């Protein structure tokens, strides 16, 4: 079975890596929509129109489901995508529920792009789960874009993370929600400054579980046959699905995309696509 995974750049590879690690038998087509990046600076209407076009691309790829591995695209445009296709659509929402449950000091920070930080959906989730917790919603206009340009922008990324982390330390934050899929790519930089006492939450496991639930609901016979075949194969290499990397910008960023994929041996191709 083939699944489409998309983001504005490299961030969604945190989700792709989690899916491939947990369910390596799935074929994955990844779209980095670099030509339209950064999503965080676009209007709601622009993002809705773009996501509908992305949906058409994945329909032509004959995928069984689409994972919108981008918080900004999820909060701004996932409803428009769902209205345009019959494929199962899985989004990424800020993992605020587990954050409030884990926070011992009841002091939580949510770090997002401006579009996500200002979205009604994020505020709804916070109001639903925060109870008596202090919540600091923080945003960066440049961090996701700079992560896409890594390693040339490494020092700029480190400076931004240093500034954000110092603000969190000043507020005595003990739980951080990374509400942009780019940010877990540099999670170790947050950990170096915030230390072991700050729990850092990201959504990849939850999104992976939701994908499998939706595939099982939508394609019960296909999933049953696939899992039966996987369980009976003695050679685990036969269960290895493929990863195909696509970019709307061209081959300029392919080396960067490749560098963030954990199972590089599963990459079977790279393509420039027009959206």
From Swiss-Prot:
PROSITE patterns: ASP_GLU_RACEMASE_1, ASP_GLU_RACEMASE_2. InterPro entries: Asp/Glu/hydantoin_racemase, Asp/Glu_race, Asp/Glu_racemase_AS_1, Asp/Glu_racemase_AS_2, Glu_race. Transmembrane segments: none annotated. GO terms for biological process: cell wall organization; peptidoglycan biosynthetic process; regulation of cell shape. Keywords: Cell shape, Cell wall biogenesis/degradation, Isomerase, Peptidoglycan synthesis. The active site is at residues 70, 180. It catalyses: L-glutamate = D-glutamate. One of its GO terms (molecular function) is glutamate racemase activity. Its EC number is 5.1.1.3. Provides the (R)-glutamate required for cell wall biosynthesis. NCBIfam families: glut_race (TIGR00067). Belongs to the aspartate/glutamate racemases family. This is Glutamate racemase. The lineage of its organism: Bacteria, Pseudomonadati, Pseudomonadota, Gammaproteobacteria, Oceanospirillales. The gene is murI.
């Amino acid at each position: 079975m083939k699944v489409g995974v998309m983001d504005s750049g490299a961030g969604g590879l945190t989700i792709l890596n989690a899916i491939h690690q947990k369910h390596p038998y799935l074929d994955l087509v990844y779209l980095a929509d670099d030509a339209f990046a950064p999503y965080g600076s676009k209007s709601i209407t622009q993002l809705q129109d773009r996501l509908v076009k992305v949906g058409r691309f994945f329909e032509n790829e004959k995928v069984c489901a689409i994972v919108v591995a981008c918080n900004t695209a999820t909060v701004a445009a996932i409803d428009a995508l769902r209205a345009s296709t019959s494929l199962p659509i899985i989004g990424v929402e800020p993992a605020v529920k587990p954050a409030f449950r884990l926070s011992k000091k009841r002091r939580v920070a949510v770090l997002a792009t401006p579009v996500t930080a200002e979205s009604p959906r994020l505020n709804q989730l916070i109001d639903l789960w925060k109870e008596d917790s202090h919540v600091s919603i923080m945003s960066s206009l440049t961090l996701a874009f700079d992560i896409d340009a890594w390693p040339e922008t490494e020092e700029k990324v480190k400076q931004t993370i240093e500034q954000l982390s110092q603000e969190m330390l000043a507020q005595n934050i003990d739980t951080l929600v990374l509400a942009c899929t780019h940010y877990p790519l540099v999670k170790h930089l947050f950990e170096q400054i915030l230390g072991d006492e700050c729990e850092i939450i990201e959504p990849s496991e939850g999104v992976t579980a939701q994908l499998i639930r939706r595939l099982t609901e939508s394609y019960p016979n296909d999933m049953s046959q696939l899992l039966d075949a996987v369980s009976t194969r003695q050679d685990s290499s036969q269960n290895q699905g493929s990863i195909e990397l696509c970019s709307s910008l061209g081959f300029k960023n392919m080396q960067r995309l490749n560098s963030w994929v954990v199972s590089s041996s599963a990459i079977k191709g790279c393509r420039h696509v027009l959206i």
